[in-house]
Amino acid sequence: MEIPLPDWVLEAGKKDPDLFFTDQYGYRNPECISLWADNAATLAGRTPMNTYKDFMISFRNTFKAELGTTLTEIAVGCGPCGELRYPAYPENRFAQKASQWRFPGIGEFQCYDQRSLLSLSRAASEAGHIEWGGSGPHDTGGYNNLPFETGFFRYDGGSWDSEYGSFFLSWYSSELVNHGDRMLEMTKRVFDKRGVTLAIKCAGVHWWYNVRSHAAELTAGYFNTRAGEFVSERDGYAPIVRVCKKHGARLNFTCVEMHDSDHPWYCYCGPEGLLRQIRSACARFDVPFAGENALCRFDQAAYDKIIKNCAGEGNDEEMWREGTMLPPMACFTFLRFNAELFSPFAFESFRIFVQRMRDETGLLDTSIGNTSDEEASTEDVDEISSESRVQLGL
């Protein structure tokens, strides 16, 4: 389901186009408000942060009886699709002449509105290189380029691996982390002592994960690279996990059903390694990790992978704290129901999957209704979704 910004926000964007993220061609993406506008009084005298807070307070007051009982988690939307990232790979054409991103394109940096350029200019001045503050990198290609087609992202000698590249990527990723910090800080104040868990979600940008530059992750805001000549090996997700730890929040992530081999070899996809990296960071910082499936899949290979990932590895708590072995997930959400799932064969497979989740992962606290396995029905699955830590969603 796609829910656009309210009309009054879109109208404000006509008066202040820098309210939205902007790419190198000047195309503005109205999917969400730019993080650089967080504290700009551009919405009838109020800032976006003011309006986010007003919405949260209204939600809290409206559902105060359900908080801590029916409603136990507040997932804070921090960007496109509710994810803490830049809209570097827009799946919908947001301007008539704008390029339509397609997998496995590397995407584009989204830092060309006036507020972001002002922030970049200030950072460049502080770094002693005012010449770096005029714009983003000039050799990054377009939405659908591949890393080796660009000067910035190419495997060897790419300018991502330079003093300038390190500066720019550090600034770009830090601005994203700071936005997540602001959002969680505000949410924590609104919902303090209400019996709910806070959570944010990172995007599963797994394409080009297995190349040195991690190009698609960089444009999305995750400075996650292998070591180069100027750039050290970076864990681009640890800063986000630290923010979660600071605010007592859970980290939600996707790709739980994926194998690397599900994807074309030439895309250098690494969903398994990416998932492990983020789970390991959560384990080291003692941050609860919640997973979900990325795609609409009802096959046995996907079910087996979900169960394996949810169960974790071993039972050595010290190795869990070190991140060398992965603890069980705190929660799993099964997404993307459709009519296919409720066909007799597919639903029987799903019923068995839910039963295995109960028996093999410890994430289910309830049986499948009060019926025998042969009698389990769609109503019983609904009961599981409302009474357990495995969530079922659309």
Tell me the role of every PLM-derived stretch.
Residues 5-242, 249:
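Polysaccharide-binding and catalytic clefts of secreted carbohydrate-active enzymes
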Residues 236-394:
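Substrate-binding cleft of secreted/luminal carbohydrate-active enzymes
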